[in-house]
């Protein structure tokens, strides 16, 4: 079991990726291969005590930047760190990939090198959000900004299977994100998707609104990558702003500071619950392999947790189980009501 880390991807690469890998290897004994400019990686590793750690270096001469086209990872920069990481996975030299780089490029490289699971047209980035009652899975949160109804239907099926067999939800409630609960709301994309999902035999509860993501009434929320990414970034910004507002209010008076001392544990638990770094990264569902996509601004904690999650994902055989379930259940779902034909028509 070995995790390949795209050490050159992300806003703070390679220092954060290297340190995150070192922490994961030291605390959890996870074998890791850092992919990127080996000279720079050796310099970064020299800042840490790596004695006894199973950390390998694999050279990649190119980097796909955050502003590069996603296709660069496939066509122009064939020796990019993210593509090379997926090549290691394909050849068996690694069992999972972790990247905080360009999410579009990561998805493109994963699709090109590993191919898609049977029955999936487009993979989706799935993100877990904390809620009042547990957790909600939202997909897609950035992989596909332009979608057709068939893609959202596939996202719904992947999310439902993931929630059941990974998150442990016995009967996941699936909702389609819209601007209101009434069937008349939404746009052409959501209305067509809504009519199709009503004919599929899982617990589809119809349209849900943005607030429903956090109140715990739904387990899987489906949307296109444009909307999902806005939701993701808005949530991160709101959590950060609320934290700063609370800090400012606490500083206003002695009584506020005293109250904080008695409530410190509650504040700490709240901060931990809304901290994206606790979740590490988001699994890329729909490709024939395990890949975790991290926030571009990921810190050491986030990279470490993404590596740990990827390791656990592989160790439990989650992707194999997901592939098996998708192959049988996707075929069954898609045959109900001639879903694919109705969309194509």
Swiss-Prot record:
BP term (GO), one: phospholipid biosynthetic process
GO molecular function: phosphate:acyl-[acyl carrier protein] acyltransferase activity
Pfam families the UniProt entry points to: FA_synthesis
Entry keyword Lipid biosynthesis: yes
GO cellular component: cytoplasm
Pathway field: Lipid metabolism; phospholipid metabolism
Location(s), subcellular: Cytoplasm
SUPFAM superfamilies assigned: Isocitrate/Isopropylmalate dehydrogenase-like (SSF53659)
Predominant cellular place of this UniProt entry's protein: cytoplasm
Catalysed reaction equations from the record: a fatty acyl-[ACP] + phosphate = an acyl phosphate + holo-[ACP]
Alphabetized InterPro entries for the sequence: FA_synthesis, Phospholipid_synth_PlsX-like
The keyword Isomerase appears for this protein: no
EC numbers on record: 2.3.1.274
Subunit annotation: Homodimer. Probably interacts with PlsY.
NCBIfam families: plsX (TIGR00182)
Stored HAMAP family: PlsX
Function in brief: Catalyzes the reversible formation of acyl-phosphate (acyl-PO(4)) from acyl-[acyl-carrier-protein] (acyl-ACP). This enzyme utilizes acyl-ACP as fatty acyl donor, but not acyl-CoA.
Protein name: Phosphate acyltransferase
Natural source organism: Geobacter metallireducens (strain ATCC 53774 / DSM 7210 / GS-15)
Gene that encodes it: plsX
